[in-house]
Curated annotation (Swiss-Prot):
PANTHER family: LIPID KINASE YEGS, SPHINGOSINE KINASE. It comes from the Bacteria. The lineage of its organism: Bacteria, Pseudomonadati, Pseudomonadota, Gammaproteobacteria, Enterobacterales. It is found in: Cytoplasm. Its main location: cytoplasm. This is Probable lipid kinase YegS. Its EC number is 2.7.1.-. GO terms for cellular component: cytoplasm; plasma membrane. It comes from Salmonella paratyphi A (strain AKU_12601).
Length: 299
């Protein structure tokens, strides 16, 4: 792999002491691969490191962390207007790794790192909310969002993605739907939503396939609503994902407008955003990402 250009790895600070990762990087450096490593400490670090990556002339910026880290790095990359932006590489090191998992990124660090450096760079979409905040994977609203934001860090560290489900069952007493109206291209729905998923990717919340047919290069966002007229059956529908479930509403559009009479919160790749009005639009071909040739998210 000695002929491959340099890369810069932006590593979430929680993974800075990952010994297998250190060994994998050392092995690649011994093969002649140039890998710069930068560790994030606070919000805004990813943007600064992407700026540095451009000065260094690297061809790939690797996001080492979970969905939040991937979001920060990809958001910084799409801000580049002059010249060709580096490609995005994915190194899943977070609690859930929903986007990387649905994209078919290898779990083995050495294989994921090689793919991030040498894989084919494919143009993929991103999404933007209210002309400001972006997400690469999914926007989730409703009870599921409250669970992912409230699940204790120690529980997530110990149990991974299943921690969200366990914490959700513990919080059944707070289970209430969100009343809202959602419009899109040839789509209109109004009612009580237990869970809302608007996906560029397919899964969120530690492996829940909220938008199982989403693709990252089709110029569309997939919508799935779990209606909340009957709360307990709707919750179990969320977990079982049956194909003929009357509590599930699906849609697809390049944009969605959401209005709620009260404040609701969406989780954008781990970042909460609250309000009563949301305009969510796809950004077609917003960045290049190194993905496996059999990536399920590509059409």
């Amino acid at each position: 792999m000695a002929n491959f250009p340099a890369s810069l790895l932006i590593l979430n600070g929680k993974s800075a002491d990952n010994q297998p990762l250190r060994e994998a990087i050392t092995l690649l450096r011994d093969e002649g691969i140039q890998i710069h490593v930068r560790v994030t400490w606070e919000k805004g670090d990813a943007q600064r490191y992407v700026d540095e990556a451009r000065r260094l002339g690297v061809e790939t910026v690797i996001a080492g962390g979970g969905d939040g880290t991937i979001n920060e790095v990809s958001t910084a990359l799409i801000q580049i207007r002059d010249g060709v932006a580096p490609a995005l590489g994915l190194l899943p090191l977070g609690t859930a790794n929903d986007f990387a998992t649905s994209a078919g990124i290898p779990e083995a660090l050495d294989k994921a790192l090689k793919l991030a450096i040498a894989g084919n760079a494919m143009e993929i979409d991103m999404a933007r909310v209210n002309d400001k905040t972006c997400f690469i994977n999914m926007a989730t609203g409703g009870f599921g969002t409250r669970i992912t934001t409230e699940t204790p860090e120690k529980l997530k560290a110990a149990l991974g993605g299943v921690s969200y489900l366990i914490h959700g069952l513990m919080r059944m007493d707070t289970l209430t739907p969100d009343r809202c109206e959602i419009r899109g291209e040839n789509f209109h729905w109004q009612g009580d939503a237990l869970v809302i998923g608007i996906g560029n990717g397919r899964q969120a919340g530690g492996g829940q396939q909220l938008c199982p047919t989403a693709l990252v290069n089709d110029g569309l966002l997939q919508l799935r609503i779990f209606t909340g007229e009957e709360l307990l059956p709707a919750l179990f529908s969320t977990l079982t994902q049956s194909d003929d479930n009357p509590n599930i509403i699906d849609g697809a559009s390049a944009w969605f407008d959401i209005h709620a009479p009260h404040e609701i919160t969406f989780n954008l790749d781990g970042e909460p955003l609250s309000g009563q009005e949301f305009h969510i639009e796809v950004l077609p071909g917003a960045l290049r990402c190194r993905l496996p040739p059999d990536c399920p998210l590509l059409r």
